Amino acid sequence: MVDAARASKLADRIQRIVAEMLERRIKDPRLGFVTVTDARLTNDLRDATVYYTVFGSDAEKAATAAALESAKGLIRSEVGRRTGLRHTPTITFVIDEVPDNARHIEELLAKAKQADAEVARAAANARPAGDPDPYREPRPADDDDEDDEDE
């Protein structure tokens, strides 16, 4: 096992290598607007997972995934050559869901803000359902009650 710091540094290096390869060396027309967002490497340095995002439709995302799968061997050999590892890690490409999740959270926050504004607008004109002063004053003592106690 390798320490986590070395695995993290190698993962960053793999991310840069893959991004550079996609930008300069791989000329597949199926590759759309691809951004390599992250790379993770297991502590035994055997498996690398590269996360990417694609700007475009679902068909473009599928075409980009196919292009990355077909270029995986070339990318892996370049990673092995440039990192100098004894065993070149296997590379798995995974589409990054973080931008979609962030967009969904922003939509939920916008809905919550709108609902809060509606509640505040309704509360500004609202009056209490009962008396304006909900606390009751003590009842005045009846004279008849005192007479009953004396008997």
UniProtKB/Swiss-Prot annotation:
It comes from the Bacteria. Keywords: Cytoplasm, Ribosome biogenesis. Its main location: cytoplasm. Pfam families: RBFA. Residues 142-151 have a biased composition (Acidic residues). Residues 116-151 are annotated as: Disordered. One of its GO terms (molecular function) is ribosomal small subunit binding. It is found in: Cytoplasm. Disulfide bonds: none annotated. One of its GO terms (cellular component) is cytosol. One of its GO terms (biological process) is maturation of SSU-rRNA. Residues 120-129 have a biased composition (Low complexity). The keyword Transmembrane helix does not apply. Monomer. Binds 30S ribosomal subunits, but not 50S ribosomal subunits or 70S ribosomes. One of several proteins that assist in the late maturation steps of the functional core of the 30S ribosomal subunit. Associates with free 30S ribosomal subunits (but not with 30S subunits that are part of 70S ribosomes or polysomes). Required for efficient processing of 16S rRNA. May interact with the 5'-terminal helix region of 16S rRNA. Belongs to the RbfA family. This is Ribosome-binding factor A.
